[in-house]
Amino acid sequence: MQVILLEKVSNLGNLGEVVRVRDGYARNFLIPQKKARRATDAALKEFEARRVELEKIQAEKLAAAQALGERLNGYQLKVAQKAGVDGRLFGSVTNADIAEGLRTAGFEGVEKSQVRLPNGQLKTVGEFPIQVGLHADVLVDVTVLVEGEMN
């Protein structure tokens, strides 16, 4: 299926590009998330009429993400989780836990889908570098310090 991208999508393209994607990806992700529209003649004409407005919205989103990224870059988040004597956690620290911790620390707008854990969930006590993708162009490094709670 061919779609018109309404915003920059990682590993796919930029605003206004007509790209070919799998039908399921378009129907289940891109179109419902308002990241793309089906590429028909009418949709292309409508897009060209709204192009300036969409580019302005994209620039505002990028500026907001960069401002949040400057505040968030190098931040150290402390997460307390129950742990055994050997330093292994009972349970794990997920990207949802990290996003929640960042939101409570005052970084509004961080979603769990933006938190990238390179080695999967955190299952031990320690310090772990992670990345937060606030925008397709804004990637921020954050350190998560997992502390063990003893009963």
Curated annotation (Swiss-Prot):
UniProt KW Nuclease keyword: no
Keywords linked to the UniProt accession: Ribonucleoprotein, Ribosomal protein, RNA-binding, rRNA-binding
Top-level taxonomic group: Bacteria
GO molecular function, a single term: structural constituent of ribosome
InterPro entries according to UniProt: Ribosomal_bL9, Ribosomal_bL9/RNase_H1_N, Ribosomal_bL9_bac/chp, Ribosomal_bL9_C, Ribosomal_bL9_C_sf, Ribosomal_bL9_N, Ribosomal_bL9_N_sf
GO process terms (BP): translation
Gene Ontology cellular component list: ribonucleoprotein complex; ribosome
Family: Belongs to the bacterial ribosomal protein bL9 family.
Function: Binds to the 23S rRNA.
HAMAP family: Ribosomal_bL9
Name the UniProt record assigns to this protein: Large ribosomal subunit protein bL9
Gene: rplI
